[in-house]
A protein has these predicted regions:
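Short small/polar-residue motifs
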Residues: 9-17, 31-34, 61-65
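Forkhead-associated
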Residues: 34-109
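Regulatory inter-domain linker segments that are low-complexity and enriched
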Residues: 1-26, 108-129
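Short polybasic amphipathic segments
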Residues: 25-30, 83-85
Length: 129
């Protein structure tokens, strides 16, 4: 697995105090209707019943991906899944998640959300017309 993030989602340096800081009011939307609050430092996603989020889809690996709370943000890690992990249509090994990101695990889609999210560093502020 590649140990670096893509250049648009680089991690900032992390202190030990920041590891495990769960983002406030984070959630994922499954199947377009089911809202699952995220309130754990580590969230495992896959077909196995032991996962935090169980996805009943044969395309999804038993232990497909993992969300980790680091520096007040969730970062998704692909766990060497067969079908891959995608964020906004781009295949990733790991990626910082931002509110509104679409996560696809081998075709099973989720939407990551967060109330009052921090700003995205890759989006420039625009002035009103």
């Amino acid at each position: 697995m590649d140990s670096t993030l893509d250049e648009t989602n680089e991690l900032e340096k992390i202190s030990e105090d920041d590891v495990g800081t769960v983002p406030e009011d984070a959630f994922v939307i499954l199947d377009g209707t089911r809202v699952v609050p995220l309130n754990q430092v580590v969230v495992n996603i896959g077909r196995r019943i032991e996962n935090t989020i169980v996805v009943d889809d044969p395309r999804v690996s038993r232990t497909h991906a993992q969300l980790r709370a680091i520096n007040g943000r969730y970062i998704i890690f692909d766990l060497n899944s067969t079908g891959g992990t995608f964020v906004n249509g781009k295949k990733v090994d790991q990626s910082i998640l931002y509110s509104g990101d679409v996560i696809s695990l081998a075709g099973a889609d989720f939407i990551y959300g967060q109330k009052n999210p921090p700003p995205r560093p890759d989006l420039k502020e625009t002035l009103p017309l």
